[in-house]
């Protein structure tokens, strides 16, 4: 038991360390360097640079990154034990915006420093993969992180631009600060297409709207699959990383239709921002794969000391997903 707790703590602490780093230190390239250190635990790390992504058409991800001098990366992390219980991998996808100014749709200056935390989804995926490797999980698992910096440079994406995503679908970018869903669109579609996973769970500090809805007590859960949702909620209850499920519906989905592209990246009606963001992501499943989206924007960091968490990054998601894998897939 002690060893198992230590393995979990090591994953959580890695996530906290990554998420708490200042943004001038932890840019996408440095993040990749940190991920590569995990190969000594038996994890396989594959890195796509901007040239590889351009070649295969990850233009939604590349569009977000084009205003920054810090180049983007897409990284897959594989844990495949010889005795794995599952033929098709469980997959976890993390949003890794190492700093988010909002781009040309610039954020207000107040509290912008918190946007160093906008890679907390990716941080959680990396911490999870470390824990799974340390405890020699019996499940075949793929972690994937999309790493970018969203900056308002001279070459930055403009509101009104249209990009052709990896899926082939065109996206009208109405707001460059709705960027997390753009990088996840390419990441989710790639994982679904290439690995045909048993399930996909994505984690992202995706919307401010989820904080309005749930504050700092629950993360938002959105899913196309009841069984997957129930399992995630149960794991969250056990680990005190609580999830609250929101609806998905065709009427919300319609709000993301663009008049000049396949989809637009924001709905300006002003309501249900977290739901419409999830509806956007759902359109980038290639197959009918069980999928869940965790919007962790209210849970990824804390402004005050909590019982066992000091001010800063919380490491939210590592314990939850480790328990989810352990309880239901091993």
Tell where the protein language model's regions lie, with residue ranges.
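Phosphate/ribose-phosphate-bearing ligand recognition and processing surfaces
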Residues: 1-41
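A generic structural signal for tightly packed, nonpolar segments enriched in small/aliphatic residues
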Residues: 15, 29-330
């Amino acid at each position: 038991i002690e060893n198992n707790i230590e393995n979990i703590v090591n994953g959580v602490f890695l996530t906290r360390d990554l998420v708490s780093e200042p943004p001038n230190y932890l840019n996408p390239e440095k993040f990749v360097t940190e991920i590569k250190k995990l190969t000594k635990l038996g994890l396989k790390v594959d890195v796509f640079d901007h040239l590889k992504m351009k070649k295969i058409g990850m233009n939604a991800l590349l569009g977000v990154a084009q205003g920054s001098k810090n180049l983007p990366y897409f990284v897959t992390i594989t844990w495949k034990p010889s005795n794995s219980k599952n033929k098709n991998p469980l997959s976890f996808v993390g949003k890794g915006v190492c700093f988010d100014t909002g781009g040309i749709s610039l954020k207000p200056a107040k509290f912008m420093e918190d946007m160093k935390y906008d890679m907390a989804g990716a941080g959680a995926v990396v911490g999870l993969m470390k824990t799974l490797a340390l405890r020699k999980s019996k499940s075949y698992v793929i972690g994937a992180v999309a790493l970018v910096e969203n900056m308002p440079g001279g070459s930055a994406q403009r509101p009104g631009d249209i990009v052709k995503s990896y899926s082939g679908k065109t996206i009208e970018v109405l707001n460059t600060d709705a960027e997390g869903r753009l990088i996840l669109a390419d990441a989710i579609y790639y994982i679904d297409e290439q690995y045909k996973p048993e399930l996909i769970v994505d984690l992202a500090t995706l919307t401010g709207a989820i904080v309005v809805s749930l504050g700092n007590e629950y993360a938002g859960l959105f899913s196309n699959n009841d069984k997957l949702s129930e399992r995630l909620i149960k794991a969250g209850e056990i680990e005190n990383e609580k999830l609250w499920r929101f609806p998905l519906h065709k009427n919300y989905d319609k709000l993301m239709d663009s008049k000049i592209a396949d989809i637009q990246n924001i709905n300006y009606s002003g309501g249900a921002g977290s739901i419409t963001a999830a509806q956007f992501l759902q359109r980038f499943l290639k197959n009918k794969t069980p999928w869940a989206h965790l919007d962790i924007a209210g849970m990824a960091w804390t402004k005050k000391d909590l019982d066992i968490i000091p001010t800063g990054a919380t490491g939210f998601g590592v314990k939850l997903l480790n328990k989810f894998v352990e309880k239901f897939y091993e």
